[in-house]
UniProtKB/Swiss-Prot annotation:
Protein name: UPF0114 protein PSPA7_5214
Keywords of the record: Cell membrane, Membrane, Transmembrane, Transmembrane helix
One Pfam family here: UPF0114
Subcellular location: Cell membrane
Membrane-traversing stretches: 15-35, 53-73, 136-156
GO cellular component: plasma membrane
Keyword match Manganese: no
Taxon lineage: Bacteria, Pseudomonadati, Pseudomonadota, Gammaproteobacteria, Pseudomonadales
Family: Belongs to the UPF0114 family.
Signal sequence region: none
Membrane topology: Multi-pass membrane protein
Length: 162
């Protein structure tokens, strides 16, 4: 009976596989939105103000960071919790494959969230004249919460590894 439960629990990790595959669909949706934004900008590129172009570029950078975060969570999550990836020898292999445990994944996710939040905050500051002061304050507080959380997670991870 015990063996059955242990085997069933171990096999249940495969329930995560469709979730990680679903993240690849989210990446596809993000890619579509990325190119939709580019196709929207191209006809207006010469008429756009520099500040507006910078806002669009920050939005594209934001999407690229989110895409990288999705890939990192998909691949390393699959490797850590479901099964090791078997990449053919002749194919290009990401240098961090097999090296990122759940602790380092959490730190990378936290760092990515801080980077994404920084880009978002920069976009807000570019349009600060149209944003009420109390909203700006809350954006900064939320961003600092992300920064402090990422710092604390990294510090705790470093302390537990040594």
């Amino acid at each position: 009976m015990e063996r059955f439960f242990e085997n069933a629990m171990y096999a249940s990790r495969w329930l995560l596989a469709p979730i990680y595959m679903g993240l690849s669909l989210a990446l596809l949706a993000l890619t579509i939105k990325f190119f939709q934004e580019i196709f929207h900008v191209i006809p207006n590129i010469f008429a756009m103000a520099e500040a507006d172009l910078i806002l669009v570029l920050l939005s594209l950078i934001d999407m690229a960071l989110v895409g990288g975060l999705l890939v990192m969570v998909m691949i390393s999550g699959y490797e850590n919790f479901v099964s090791q990836l078997d990449i053919d020898e002749g194919k290009e292999k990401l240098n961090w494959l097999g090296k990122m445990d759940s602790g380092s994944l959490k730190n990378k996710v936290a760092a990515s969230i801080v980077a994404i939040s920084s880009i978002h905050l920069l976009r807000i500051f570019m349009d600060a004249k149209n944003v009420p002061d109390n909203k700006l304050m809350w954006y900064v507080i939320i961003h600092m919460t992300f920064v402090l959380s990422a710092f604390a997670m990294g510090y705790l991870d470093k302390q537990t590894r040594h």
